[in-house]
A protein has these predicted regions:
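A noncatalytic interaction/capping subdomain that flanks phosphate/NTP-handling catalytic cores
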Residues: 1-101, 111-123, 129-158
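Conserved lysine of the Walker
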Residues: 105
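Hydrophobic positions on the alpha1 helix immediately C-terminal to the Walker A/P-loop
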Residues: 108
């Protein structure tokens, strides 16, 4: 079963549809660590979810949403959670800008990129994972990177 390194977790995922396959591809893990957990939705869960999604939604979208939901529930029990924010790395440290939708988190992040150039890069522009490891808060990217993301990394940043 394929394993992926996502937000510093080794996760078993079996993408069935192209959208999730493409999202997962850069995170493929071939190392020796065993999986921390699996995030594999059942067919019945996918079909149930799709029937409740906005008209016109695809099974590909349902699979990504279902897999992300499983992932999100499982990381909570491992000292991590998603934070609705825009996260960037500046001089090796993560900075998160969190607010209601439409306030300007991404705009603020882009201003940092413009101001600091190559010293800064986007880690995740929507829902980075924050976890505590050895009493240190760390920020990690996850599958849903934006087109503006300059760095695809599995490395956590303090």
């Amino acid at each position: 079963m394929p394993k992926y390194l996502i937000a510093d977790f080794i996760v078993e995922i079996e993408p069935k549809f192209d959208y999730l396959k493409k999202l997962c591809e850069p995170f493929l893990y071939e190392g020796e660590r065993s999986a921390d957990f699996s995030a594999i939705p059942s067919d019945s869960y996918l079909n149930s979810l799709l029937s409740r999604m906005v008209e016109g939604s695809t099974i590909d979208e349902a699979e990504e949403f279902a897999t992300a939901s499983i992932f999100n529930r499982k990381i909570i029990h491992r000292g991590a959670m998603l934070v609705h924010s825009s996260a960037l790395v500046f001089d090796g440290k993560a900075y998160l800008f969190s607010a209601d939708s439409g306030v300007g988190k991404s705009t603020h992040t882009k201003m940092w990129l413009k101001r600091f150039g190559s010293k800064a890069h986007i880690l995740n522009d929507d829902k980075p994972v924050v976890k505590i490891k050895n009493e240190v808060p760390l920020c990690c990217g996850e599958l849903r990177l934006t087109a503006e993301a300059e760095l695809l990394t599995t490395k956590p940043f303090p």
